[in-house]
Amino acid sequence: MAPSRNGMILNPHFHKDWQKRVRTWFNQPARKIRRRKARQAKARRIAPRPVSGPLRPVVRCPTIRYHTKVRAGRGFTLEELKAAGINKKVARTIGISVDSRRRNRSTESLQANVQRLKEYRTKLIIFPRKAAKPKKGDSTEEELKMATQLTGPVMPIKKVHKKEKARVISEDEKNFKAFASLRMARANARLFGIRAKRAKEAAEQDVEKKK
């Protein structure tokens, strides 16, 4: 077996007929063709729906190390769907992924995904189940003629980077300790309840002493 990760480099002493036991991967080119054919078959099967699957939300990666990066998530929260005015059962039928476990921890993320859903609804073309009897909300015949299968990702996420002009670094910025400030803010948030409880107990003790 080939060495993996950061382990000890092996020094195996082969005595048996080891050439027979060598793991080979000669099936990879055929696998590549098989995967491609499967993708094409799926695209034909789900047409005219998008090839890449349903619409995904914009989420931030977890942990301090990666939370500056934005990527596509698993599904929209029930809160986001409610704010956008979309039923959670209907959402799955019109190509919107739903994740009931995810929670919105900020107003910004909620607003961004609600806006994404609303924009998606404006671009969406819904085919009637029965062509002779179109229901309310189904697209018109002119829109249906314009419909084509989307090959790329649905509403790709754009990573925007604001470029700042060169300027002189101020003395306050030089003295500012970013990591220490973040740690202090996290500590204050963590100890907020404990400190409030201690302050309340201290105030009660002062009142009792005065009596």
Swiss-Prot record:
Keyword Protein biosynthesis belongs to the record: no
InterPro entries for this protein: Ribosomal_eL13, Ribosomal_eL13_CS
GO BP terms in the entry: embryonic cranial skeleton morphogenesis; regulation of cell cycle; translation
Compartment(s) where it occurs, according to its Swiss-Prot or TrEMBL record: Cytoplasm
Assigned keywords, A-Z: Cytoplasm, Ribonucleoprotein, Ribosomal protein
GO cellular component, one term: cytosolic large ribosomal subunit
GO molecular function terms attached to this record: RNA binding; structural constituent of ribosome
Function summary: Component of the ribosome, a large ribonucleoprotein complex responsible for the synthesis of proteins in the cell. The small ribosomal subunit (SSU) binds messenger RNAs (mRNAs) and translates the encoded message by selecting cognate aminoacyl-transfer RNA (tRNA) molecules. The large subunit (LSU) contains the ribosomal catalytic site termed the peptidyl transferase center (PTC), which catalyzes the formation of peptide bonds, thereby polymerizing the amino acids delivered by tRNAs into a polypeptide chain.
Family: Belongs to the eukaryotic ribosomal protein eL13 family.
Record note on quaternary structure: Component of the 60S large ribosomal subunit (LSU).
Listed name of the protein: Large ribosomal subunit protein eL13
Lineage: Eukaryota, Metazoa, Chordata, Craniata, Vertebrata
